[in-house]
Amino acid sequence: MKKLLSLLLAAVMVLSMAACGSSSSAPAATTAAANTSASSGDASEAPKKGIDMTFTIFLDPASTDDPRSVVLKEIVDEYNATNAYGNTVTVESIHWSQYESQLIQKTAAGNGPDIVNAFSDQLMQHIEAGTIQPMTKYAKEFIAENPAYIHTAEKLTQADGEIYSLPWESRVTVNWYRTDIYDKAPETWDELLATAEKSTDLAMGFAVGLSDGSNGTALMETFTPWLRSAGGDLFDKDGKAIFNSEAGVKVVNFIKQLVEAGTMDKSVLNMAYDDVVDAFKSGTVYAMDAGTQRASAIKSSDLASNFASAPIAGVNGAAPAFVAGQTLAIGSQAKDPDMAWDFIRYFYTVENQKKWMSAKCMTVRTDVFDDPEIQAMDDYEEMKMWSEYATTGSMTFFPADYTELETRIAQAVQSVVFQGADAQTALDSVADWYNNK
């Protein structure tokens, strides 16, 4: 109980990551119910009576501003109208900035949902807080029956031997750049450093946000693949922090070099994730690293015809991909796990994955790319490139206290780049704090 209360208190102070990006509001629960023709199961397999279930997610099915919300409503409506059991799913939308804290509070109060959307970076937080339960049996059967699903049971299995969720979309951090400014995207650190000549008094060239705002996420989505490109990693197999390695020092000093050379402007000190994306969209930044979940927002810019994306530059070639994704799990207080699973598996059909692709969410099924409708999409080749680049990395399930760690790493990098601190000393301080907590 002490551990749960501790996690609850911590979660109230934490901003969680959004999803394929973030939703713009935090509305009350919305019930989805409409008429469609798809079916999620065979009536002969329905010995149970239907039940009412709740589904928490950061998207709002009542909103038409976000294409992902529109797809969510369509999928839930179809399930409610056609599932073999007569189940009804009610969506409870929670804004991404309050998602973990509110969900943990609801569960602690005995009002946990039947179905939980959990971002991969925060999955361990849900496991430790007890908001979700193992779904190993369902997951292994599903993966065995669906060879086109991109995730393996082995990679989704946690330290306790259980699988707690299945990713329903993927996103990978890529380099976005202006084709009217650069002939091609840089592939190596040296090539990236050389783009300093494109920076002007009116526009920054390349930008990685170094602010510790939003938990330092802007930095970590580049720091991590660069660290792996240099031969290091954040943690060892036992969960010990090892980013203060020679590779980690090399990355921090390279970031400092980018600022000193003028490749990045000093204003990145105060730029968080959204600041960098907005600057790129407005034309005051010429290149950046950002997740593919931001594609719809990025391409809403008047300059979008000059935007392109590519793998992130690494030490001697493309850096290993930083992969994350939204996942679905069975709530720890689900009234009937079998029924919760019946809804969850409906998310992963080819038809529903095609719908998510139309909303610029990367599919978790390779066979979706074989569909003629998908191949006819204007950005088919780009999205296929994202999917192929994602195979160079793997989804990482970070520890429950990862949010505080990434904030401290961002602060350490700031001290080196802008205050002249020693990179090894700065990283050692954060690693020692983490390993001795």
Model-based region annotation:
Residues 51, 78-88, 261, 300-362, ...:
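Extracytoplasmic/periplasmic substrate-recognition and gating elements
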Residues 46, 260, 388-437:
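Conserved C-terminal helix/tail region of periplasmic/extracytoplasmic solute-binding proteins
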